[in-house]
């Protein structure tokens, strides 16, 4: 499949999806939203881990406000028909999804990153819930992710003041996993992603399923889910390999089964 707004690369079990409209800071237009969603579904069948990153100086500046085709659009329709499938493709993906935020992530672009399981940012990157600057409220999942990740007080401040949050501050406040010096950034995220691509895929999928369920489950239901999922993992080839590798004092060779 050919793409016009993104790049898709796969190697050694890792799919790297790059937002590729650097001339507009990788702003999201309809074509990019559709291509991202399609690429994410494709990666589920080809890869063991996924990376989302951006080309040029930005990760993603959010909705393309300069897109002539977007004039007069119905925001509710766009969110329901284009953003929701994209965000669900990230959040519900059984594979680990890593966002490598190379630069500015604003508006829906910030929330696109936050939909990932792990966010690693270059130190020069920044996050901004820019919506109120143009008379809107956070969307693209922002009102769901932000309070859960940083608490209500910080989420409210980020939304109401629409200020830039630097990568190091974002890491300190728990918005992202880590901030990395720019000079080391690509090498670092590729090493992290390779670790995920070589890892126990079924265990990673179970972690995601359990953590997501834990956001709403009462404790008894969560304990029951843990027991069921752990029982399934205990029958896996990767569990047997992990135990054998531990006993033999060698690195495990996981196959994802």
From Swiss-Prot:
Record InterPro entries: ClpP/crotonase-like_dom_sf, Enoyl-CoA_hyd/isom_CS, Enoyl-CoA_hydra/iso, Enoyl-CoA_hydra_C
Pfam families membership: ECH_1 (PF00378)
GO molecular function, one term: enoyl-CoA hydratase activity
Similarity-based family: Belongs to the enoyl-CoA hydratase/isomerase family.
CDD domains for the chain: crotonase-like
Enzyme class, first EC level, given as a word: lyase
Lyase listed as a keyword: yes
Protein name per Swiss-Prot or TrEMBL: Probable enoyl-CoA hydratase
Source organism (scientific name): Rhodobacter capsulatus (strain ATCC BAA-309 / NBRC 16581 / SB1003)
One annotated GO biological process: fatty acid metabolic process
Reactions catalysed: a (3S)-3-hydroxyacyl-CoA = a (2E)-enoyl-CoA + H2O; a 4-saturated-(3S)-3-hydroxyacyl-CoA = a (3E)-enoyl-CoA + H2O
